[in-house]
Amino acid sequence: MAETEKMKYGSLNRFAQAVTGLFLLFFLGVHLYVAHIDFGHPVAFFSSVINQLHNPWWLAFFLIFVYIITYHGINGLNHIVADTSISEKAKRNIGIALMVIYVITIIYGTILALLVARMTVPT
């Protein structure tokens, strides 16, 4: 029974990896267009990001983008570790370390986005 639960969790993790990968394609495309291109013309990156982060919808978009990127990367690393032949204890410890890195990264990303959203746009 424990093996079946482990397999389901692994399948769920791999499914989440695929879904977040698809979301990343969408988010990355929107991010690159909005942050770097304005109807085919280059725009000032820093000012455009600050302007966008003043809008609560764009702020939410970028925060979700950070959460999904971080989850996708950490989960991918965890899959790589799971496929190695190191001990289960080492895998568990690395998994815990990766969770800590995930939490620290999303806290940092959230704080940074909220601070940038409060900045005034340079003229």
Curated annotation (Swiss-Prot):
A GO molecular function held by the record: metal ion binding
Write out the pathway annotation from the protein's UniProt entry. Carbohydrate metabolism; tricarboxylic acid cycle
Cytoplasmic topological domain ranges are 1-13, 82-91
Q: Mind telling me which GO cellular component terms the entry cites?
A: plasma membrane
Please name the GO terms of the biological process aspect recorded for this protein, alphabetically: tricarboxylic acid cycle
Q: Which residues cross the membrane?
A: 14-34, 60-81, 92-116
Q: What cofactor does this chain's UniProt record say it requires? A: heme
Cofactor, free-text remark: The heme is bound between the two transmembrane subunits.
Source taxon at top rank: Archaea
Which parts of the sequence bind heme? H72
**InterPro entries, A to Z:** SQR/QFR_C/D (IPR034804), Succ_DH_cytb556 (IPR014314), SuccDH_FuR_B_TM-su (IPR000701)
Question: Which stretches are Extracellular in the membrane topology?
Answer: 35-59
Note the topology in the membrane: Multi-pass membrane protein
Major place of residence: membrane
Instruction: Write the record's keywords in alphabetical order, separated by commas.
Output: Cell membrane, Electron transport, Heme, Iron, Membrane, Metal-binding, Transmembrane, Transmembrane helix, Transport, Tricarboxylic acid cycle
**How is the quaternary structure described?**
Part of an enzyme complex containing four subunits: a flavoprotein, an iron-sulfur protein, plus two membrane-anchoring proteins, SdhC and SdhD.
Functional note: Membrane-anchoring subunit of succinate dehydrogenase (SDH).
What protein does this entry describe? Succinate dehydrogenase hydrophobic membrane anchor subunit
The record lists the organism as Thermoplasma acidophilum (strain ATCC 25905 / DSM 1728 / JCM 9062 / NBRC 15155 / AMRC-C165)
